């Protein structure tokens, strides 16, 4: 379906307005970012017209307690559609208008992450807020970071909800059982495309710090909405992130600033104890 200046194109501007309002309500962007972020999204969807008055009136109004200047309240989101539903509508428009060339799982994951990258604050902002909240308490800081990772759709809550979890009694005590269903199966078309893609050694692996903001491709996930937190452990630079697949509650990953082989030795346990000291 070709876009027109009329009804169908007006739908994408409504979705853009809805996503911008979602971003403000969830603390991803502030009021002063609204025009900038809207323009980035209009560029992404190749839209030339935007009725500011109508789109702003159609967007859900935020109460005073939900405006960005009240930083303690900004994560108390208004009642919006789940972000994956907004993104699904945006991707449908993108595919039908030739902006997104394929509609496979990987192609959609690459594109919706690119969308979310437009409303995800830069590393400096996220790290400053984490540091400010850490000054209150480590728990306040990590709670913020976990909520942020969900709001940015780095942790895809709709997929995590599919996981099967239960506790079973055994002769050794209770054991938590998890069947992880949040990581989607590869489409054969994606596998074929990844096999033909030019090989790249950047980033060196899926955990390296260079993944932050990376666009990704058919054999490497997009990470435009990914933000990492620096931590110093036993005098060495490390980074912290939450796992996008949440294999267990608030699944956290700590990784070296350098791409180095994983090795279990005395130094590792010193770093683990240092981390626990900083985040009791």
What do the predicted segments below correspond to?
Residues 1-266:
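Active-site microenvironments that recognize anionic phosphate/pyrophosphate groups
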Residues 264-279:
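Long, well-ordered alpha-helical scaffolding segments within enzyme catalytic domains
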């Amino acid at each position: 379906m070709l876009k027109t200046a009329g009804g169908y194109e007006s739908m994408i501007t409504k979705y853009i307005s809805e996503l911008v309002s979602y971003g403000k309500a969830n603390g991803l962007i502030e009021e002063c970012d609204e025009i900038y972020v809207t323009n980035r999204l209009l560029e992404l969807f190749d839209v030339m017209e935007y009725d500011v008055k109508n789109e702003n009136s159609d967007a859900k109004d935020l109460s005073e307690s939900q405006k960005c200047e009240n930083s303690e309240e900004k994560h108390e989101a208004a009642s919006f559609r789940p972000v994956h539903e907004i993104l699904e509508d945006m991707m449908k428009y993108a595919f039908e208008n030739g902006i997104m060339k394929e509609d496979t799982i990987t192609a959609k994951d690459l594109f919706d992450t690119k969308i979310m990258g437009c409303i995800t604050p830069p590393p400096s902002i996220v790290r400053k807020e984490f540091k400010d909240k850490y000054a209150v308490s480590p728990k306040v800081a990590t709670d913020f970071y976990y909520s942020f990772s969900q709001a940015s759709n780095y942790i895809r809550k709709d997929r995590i909800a599919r996981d099967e979890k239960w506790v079973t009694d055994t002769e050794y005590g209770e054991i938590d059982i998890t069947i992880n269903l949040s990581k989607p199966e590869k489409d054969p078309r994606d596998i074929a495309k990844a096999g033909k893609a030019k090989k790249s050694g950047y980033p060196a692996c899926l955990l390296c710090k260079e993944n932050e903001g990376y666009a990704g491709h058919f054999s490497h996930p997009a990470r435009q909405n990914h933000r990492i937190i620096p931590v110093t452990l036993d005098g060495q630079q490390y980074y912290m992130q939450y796992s996008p697949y949440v294999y267990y509650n608030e699944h956290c990953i700590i990784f070296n600033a350098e791409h180095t082989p994983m090795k279990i030795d005395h130094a590792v346990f010193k770093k683990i104890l240092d981390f626990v000291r900083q985040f009791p």
